[in-house]
Amino acid sequence: MKENMLFSGESKNIEYKVTVPDKSEKYMKTVVAFANGKGGKIVFGVDDKTLEIVGMNTENIYKTMDAITNAISDACEPAIRPDVALQTVKDKTVIVVEILPGAQRPYYIKSHGMIDGTYVRVSGTTRHVEGYMLKELILE
C-alpha cells in the first residue's frame, strides 16, 4: 500500500495504534472486524488522533511482531493468519498488520464466543454485531 494511502486517516480498512497494547484484546476486535469485512491494516506506531508517526521501539521489534502474530492466531476463531511487516516512514519504523478478508465468516474472539465476540467495521470504527448482522455473516 502506498505511504500516502496508509497514513491518510482511520477508515473502514485502516486502524492506528500508538503502541502495541499489553492486552491484545484491545486490538483483537479490529482484527476480527477486518476479517469479517473486506480486510484491513492495523498500523502500530501512529497516533490515531493526530496521525503523527511516532514509530516503534526497534530494540525487540521482531519479538513484538511474533507476539502480535501469536496473539491473533491464538485468540481468533476460525484462525486468522495475519501478515505482519515493518515499514519505515520518515526515519521511523512502524509495524503494519494486514488482515485479509476471511472466507469462513463469522470470525470472532474465541474467549468471548460467537455471539459476544463478533465485530464488524463501520467507517473508522469497530462495532459489535447485532443479531441480524451475525445471521448475515453466517449465511454469506
Please identify what each model-predicted range represents:
Residues 1-140:
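Conserved N-terminal catalytic/coupling substructures associated with nucleotide/phosphate chemistry
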